[in-house]
From Swiss-Prot:
It comes from the Bacteria. Its main location: membrane. GO terms for cellular component: plasma membrane. It is a multi-pass membrane protein. GO terms for molecular function: fumarate transmembrane transporter activity; malate:proton symporter activity; succinate transmembrane transporter activity. The keyword Transmembrane helix applies. This is C4-dicarboxylate transport protein. Belongs to the dicarboxylate/amino acid:cation symporter (DAACS) (TC 2.A.23) family. InterPro entries: C4_dicarb_transport, Na-dicarboxylate_symporter, Na-dicarboxylate_symporter_CS, Na:dicarbo_symporter_sf. It is found in: Cell inner membrane. It comes from Yersinia pestis.
Amino acid sequence: MKVSIFKTLYFQVLTAITIGVLLGHFYPEIGAQMKPLGDGFVKLIKMIIAPVIFCTVVTGIAGMESMKAVGRTGAIALLYFEIVSTLALLIGLVVVNVAQPGVGMNIDPATLDAKAVALYAEQASQQGIIPFLLDIIPGSVVGAFASGNILQVLLFAVLFGFALHRLGEKGQLIFNVIESFSRVIFGVINMIMRLAPLGAFGAMAFTIGKYGVGSLVQLGQLILCFYLTCILFVVLVLGTIAKFNGFNIFKFIRYIKEELLIVLGTSSSESVLPRMLDKMENAGCKKSVVGLVIPTGYSFNLDGTSIYLTMAAVFIAQATNTHMDIMHQVTLLVVLLLSSKGAAGVTGSGFIVLAATISAVGHLPLAGLALILGIDRFMSEARALTNLVGNGVATIVVAKWCKQLDNDQLQAVLSNKVLPNVKSSVSVS
């Protein structure tokens, strides 16, 4: 039976975003008051992320035949993340140098309001590779779940999955309980996702109402340049990777169109993390691969954020007439290879990492951040959308390289064929 287009989440979210834009533009004061709707939806999603990751990773690892496969999957995923995110940084650097969106603005850093970015600068001072690595280890298991820290929950889930696997048949009861709990959690997600149009409406109405279309026009060249670069990256880089791994990037984008629209409305790729776990498994990727690649990718494979970081940093230099020779840009690239891994798939994290990078490089005026503070929210959409597509592609590629991909299933879902929703039953090896 064909579902009416009016009942699809895709149509409802698209309609909600359109209404949000109109409300924010024509009635900005009312639009700015819609923020709680978007925040509330994102908080509901965050509430469920930790248990979803735990259940997915534990059942995925515990159900594998060999623990060597888990280590191999993790190593391949990290190698892929490093290569592709480095490509994203380089592409952003090349485009911003060619397009030069900041040249001619002639901004004096002394005239900028440094107070506007003081909070971000303070948060940036806490960034660093050692604190980042130590932060992956939770102070307590309960604390990891309470704070919703993705990497902390992932670490505990991996260890728990290994331990459960070693129990063999003795751990079967625990495995069954967690798998049943996982079904309940995904049932909760289905209920929450009914509110996605409301969340997208509130977030978009607030963005347009508070910042206005005028802020888009003022720095439109940078925004346009960034959006085009993200499209270029998705079509050429991710498209080429997809082609060499046997699937079409445009068919994949169509497959996750509902998730992309939710991200467009909320500006956070984290808002669809639970749905992506389910969708990638439905696309033929083994649960063990999905459970490792998707959550890890939310910190280590943020392609859109990587493009944004290089473009924004060089744009500030161009706008303030700060000279950046080749060595300065190489230094910037090296710093970003480390600092970009500290970003998360949440709104605003990219701006904090940018502040940390500028502080670390030392050559750029920190006050220059005030130039893009007003438009960062608009650039956040492109970052989040590119991040989401990038992590989806990464999951399929890693699954294929690890021989954990059902290619027939993948081609069927990408071709929009209806398949029986059969969950294969697995047991603790």
